[in-house]
C-alpha cells in the first residue's frame, strides 16, 4: 500500500475513519524509504523498530481527530537529537552518539502524535551546500541523481521530493533548508530566529541556526511549523509564540500587498533562466493584485564574506566540545592526552569541517579579531538595517532562492569559494534573523527553480499567505520527479 500522493489532511481523514492505522501508514512509509534509498542515500538511520513502537502506541490510544498530525510519519535531520536514535551529524566524530533526550522540536512533534521514522543525511555538521561532505556519502537530487540535492539539509529535502516521506525537519544556518528545497522542487521554510527552539540541535553557528520544516505544499509546511514552534526555557534565544496557527492567512488574497524585488538579487552571477523565472513570478504576483517594485539592498553583496567569518568563528567554538574524551570517535593511535585531542579531531572531522574550524580560529585570534570578526559584526548590522529600511515600506521581499539550479555532483568540491557563493541569496536572511521560504516557481534544464519570499521578523503567516496564493494559481508544486512517479 502506498500513500505517496496523499496530503497530510487526506491521510488524517483516512486515519480518523480507520481506513488505515498509524502502524500501516508507518510501515508503508518505511517501505517507501527503503525502496528509494539505494538511489538517493537520503537517510543515515532508518528507525524502523522505534517508529513501529510509536505507531502501535498511537493506534492503541486512538488517533486524535482534532490534531491533523496525529499518526503522521516524520523524518528528522541527523543533527537534531532524537532519544534512543543515532544522531551523528553525518560525521565520523559522532558515529556512535545516541542521545538520551529529544530536541525540543522533536519532542513537540511527538506530543502532536508524529512518528519519527529516521534520521536524514546531511553535510557534515551542517557545513556544506551540496550534500556531499557527509561521512556517509553524498545524497542525490530527487530529480536527477547526477546532480547535488543542495545542503546542508540534503536528505530531508530529497526524502520529501522523492516521496520517501511527506514531512521532514531540517536546519538552516545560511540557506540549508531553502537551497535544498529549491533544488528539489519542494517547500522549505527558515523561521524567524527564536521561533523554534534550538535545544537539542547540534550547534554550528549559534546566532544563525534555526530548525524548520520541509513539505510538498505550503499548507503542509505551515502545519508542521505549528507543531514544532514553541518558547523554551532550555533555549534562552527562543521567543514567545505570537500566533496559534501559522495557516491562519492561507487562502486570503494578496491584493494590495507590497512586495520588493531587490536589484542585487537579479544581478551578476544569477543564471539567466533563473532570473527570467523570477521575473515571470513577479508578474504573476502582480496579476494576483500585489504591488511589486524594485528596491536596493546595497550591503547584501557582503553577506557571504560576513557569514563565513561569523559562522566559522562560532563553529570553531562550538566544535571544541568534540575532543575524543566524553563521547564520539576516539583515535586509537594516541599515547597521551594531547595526542587523543589532536588525533581524534584530525581523524574524526572531515576536510570541510576542519577548513571552517581553522578559518574561525584565525578570525578570533589575537591581532585579527578586530580586523575580521568585529568588522564582520559591524557589516552584519548594515545588512540588518538594509532590510529594516525595505520593510518600512514593503510587506515582503521576492527573489530567487539560489543563483542556479542544481549542479553536477563533484563539480565544485575543488573550489570551496564557488560553492560558498551558491548561498549568496539565502545568507543575508540568517544574518538578519528573518523568516524566509522557498517554493517551486518553474524549471530550467528540467530542474526545479526556487522562489524565495522573505519577511520581517515574525511574519511567517504573511509569507505563507503569499506563497499559498502563488501555489494555488500555478502547478509547479504538482510536478514530480520520476522516482516519485512523475513524468519529469
Curated annotation (Swiss-Prot):
Annotated TM spans: none
Keyword ATP-binding: yes
Keywords: ATP-binding, Ligase, Nucleotide-binding, Protein biosynthesis
InterPro entries cross-referenced by the UniProt entry: Amidase, Amidase_CS, Amidase_dom, AS_sf, GatA
GO cellular component, one term: glutamyl-tRNA(Gln) amidotransferase complex
GO terms, molecular function: ATP binding; glutaminyl-tRNA synthase (glutamine-hydrolyzing) activity
This enzyme's EC code(s): 6.3.5.7
Catalyzed reactions per annotation: L-glutamyl-tRNA(Gln) + L-glutamine + ATP + H2O = L-glutaminyl-tRNA(Gln) + L-glutamate + ADP + phosphate + H(+)
Gene Ontology biological process: translation
Coiled-coil positions: none
Active site: 77, 152, 176
Similarity comment text for this entry: Belongs to the amidase family. GatA subfamily.
Stored NCBIfam families: gatA (TIGR00132)
Subunit annotation: Heterotrimer of A, B and C subunits.
UniProt function note: Allows the formation of correctly charged Gln-tRNA(Gln) through the transamidation of misacylated Glu-tRNA(Gln) in organisms which lack glutaminyl-tRNA synthetase. The reaction takes place in the presence of glutamine and ATP through an activated gamma-phospho-Glu-tRNA(Gln).
Name this polypeptide is given: Glutamyl-tRNA(Gln) amidotransferase subunit A
Organism: Streptococcus pneumoniae serotype 19F (strain G54)
Amino acid at each position: 500500500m502506498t500513500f505517496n500522493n496523499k496530503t497530510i489532511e487526506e491521510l488524517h481523514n483516512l486515519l480518523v475513519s480507520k481506513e488505515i492505522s498509524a502502524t500501516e501508514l508507518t510501515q508503508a512509509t518505511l517501505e517507501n524509504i527503503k525502496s528509494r534509498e539505494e538511489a538517493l542515500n537520503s537517510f543515515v538511520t532508518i528507525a524502523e523498530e522505534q517508529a513501529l513502537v510509536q505507531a502501535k502506541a498511537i493506534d492503541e490510544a486512538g488517533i486524535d481527530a482534532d490534531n491533523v498530525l496525529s499518526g503522521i510519519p516524520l523524518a528528522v535531520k541527523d543533527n537534531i537529537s532524537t532519544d534512543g536514535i543515532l544522531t551523528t551529524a553525518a560525521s565520523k566524530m559522532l558515529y556512535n552518539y545516541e542521545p538520551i533526550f529529544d530536541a525540543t522540536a522533536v519532542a513537540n512533534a511527538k506530543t502532536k502524535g508524529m512518528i519519527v521514522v529516521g534520521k536524514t543525511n546531511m553535510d557534515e555538521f551542517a557545513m556544506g551546500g551540496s550534500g556531499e561532505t557527509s561521512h556517509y556519502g553524498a545524497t542525490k537530487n530527487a530529480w536527477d541523481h547526477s546532480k547535488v540535492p543542495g545542503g546542508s539539509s540534503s536528505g530531508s529535502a530529497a526524502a520529501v521530493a522523492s516521496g520517501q516521506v511527506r514531512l521532514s525537519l531540517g536546519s538552516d544556518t545560511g540557506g540549508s533548508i531553502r537551497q535544498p528545497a529549491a533544488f528539489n522542487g519542494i517547500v522549505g521554510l527558515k523561521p524567524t530566529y527564536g521561533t523554534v527552539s534550538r535545544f537539542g540541535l547540534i550547534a554550528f553557528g549559534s546566532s544563525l541556526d534555526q530548525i524548520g520544516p520541509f513539505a510538498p505544499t505550503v499548507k503542509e509546511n505551515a502545519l508542521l511549523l505549528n507543531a514544532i514552534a514553541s518558547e523554551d526555557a532550555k533555549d534562552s534565544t527562543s521567543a514567545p509564540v505570537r500566533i496559534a496557527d501559522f495557516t491562519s492567512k492561507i487562502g486570503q488574497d494578496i491584493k494590495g500587498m507590497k512586495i520588493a524585488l531587490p536589484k542585487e538579487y537579479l544581478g551578476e552571477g544569477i543564471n539567466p533562466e533563473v532570473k527570467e523565472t523570477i521575473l515571470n513570478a513577479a508578474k504573476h504576483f502582480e496579476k494576483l493584485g500585489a504591488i511589486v517594485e524594485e528596491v536596493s539592498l546595497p550591503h547584501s553583496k557582503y553577506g557571504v564574506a560576513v557569514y563565513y567569518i561569523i559562522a566559522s568563528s562560532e563553529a570553531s567554538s562550538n566544535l571544541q566540545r568534540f575532543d575524543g574524551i566524553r563521547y564520539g570517535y576516539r583515535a586509537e593511535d594516541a599515547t597521551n592526552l594531547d595526542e587523543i585531542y589532536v588525533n581524534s579531531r584530525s581523524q574524526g572531522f572531515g576536510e570541510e569541517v576542519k577548513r571552517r574550524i581553522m578559518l574561525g580560529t584565525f578570525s578570533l585570534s589575537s591581532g585579527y579579531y578586530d580586523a575580521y570578526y568585529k568588522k564582520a559584526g559591524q557589516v552584519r548590522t548594515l545588512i540588518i538595517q538594509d532590510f529594516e529600511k525595505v520593510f518600512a515600506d514593503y510587506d515582503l521581499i521576492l527573489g530567487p532562492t539560489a543563483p542556479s539550479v542544481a549542479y553536477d555532483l563533484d563539480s565544485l568540491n575543488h573550489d570551496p569559494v564557488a560553492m560558498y557563493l551558491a548561498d549568496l541569496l539565502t545568507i543575508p536572511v540568517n544574518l538578519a534573523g528573518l523568516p524566509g521560504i522557498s517554493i517551486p516557481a518553474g524549471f530550467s534544464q528540467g530542474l526545479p527553480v526556487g522562489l524565495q519570499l522573505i519577511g520581517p521578523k515574525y511574519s511567517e503567516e504573511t509569507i505563507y499567505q503569499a506563497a499559498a496564493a502563488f501555489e494555488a494559481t500555478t502547478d509547479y508544486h504538482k510536478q514530480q520527479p520520476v522516482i516519485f512517479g512523475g513524468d519529469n
